[in-house]
Amino acid sequence: MSSFEEYFSKHASEYAKSKSHKSGEDLKSLLTIVNPESSWKVLDMATGTGFTAMAIAPFVSEVIGLDATEEMLSNAVMLSEKSGLRNVKFIKGRVEHSGLEGGSFDLVTCRRAAHHFPDKTAFVVESKRVLKDGGLFALIDMVRPEKDKDNVRNRLEILRDSSHVDAPTVKFWSDLLSKNGFREVETISTKERIAFPDFLSPVNVDSEEGKACLDYLKSISRESLVNADIDPDDLSIIKERVIFLYRKVE
């Protein structure tokens, strides 16, 4: 079992109860800027427990939620059945090679997951492949501050969650999408300061991972902390999430 499968299998039930994943401001913003249409067929990549797929479902014809972890999919199916939605289907697959028919989706979404992907280029290329010409691609994820030259934020995330690979900068994503057949429609950034224990969630402060994160932050300079948008005194963290809305170039 890979590190991300092990992590999400362990924490699937916590994600299924996460208010932030179910109804976060980034999800509300996504629905607003995408403005889904009733005829659309939608693919939600790395759907997790299915909150993004289920939020979009009432506005479109069909949604497929794809994920690589059985436990996350089981929770997604359970939650969708409770909601009474009949146009959502969850399937197991990888974002780099979904196995789905090319040119078949009006919208591809991916929310709070891309920092787990080891091959981000393959993910973007696969997203383009399954989209119809002119289709929309909506990516929402955390990003690293441009000034964080010591890569503190990614090092911290890996200590908290071994399945974390890399949360790159805004420029990285915009360049990658532009080079692979997408044109920018809109990019929206949201920032919030969160307390250290909330940053760790669903990991506990007293856990081995929580203690490792705290020890790491105490070991680095104030300047490095500030550049990583971490308060040197209370260790609260400014978390930036960005919505990248791009269109597949015909």
Name what the model sees in each region.
Residues 1-40, 51-55, 71-75, 79-83, 138-161, ...:
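Conserved class I S-adenosyl-L-methionine
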Residues 121-136:
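A short glycine-rich, Lys/Arg-flanked "PGG" loop and its adjoining helix->strand segment in the class I
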Residues 49, 120, 184-250:
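Conserved Class I S-adenosyl-L-methionine
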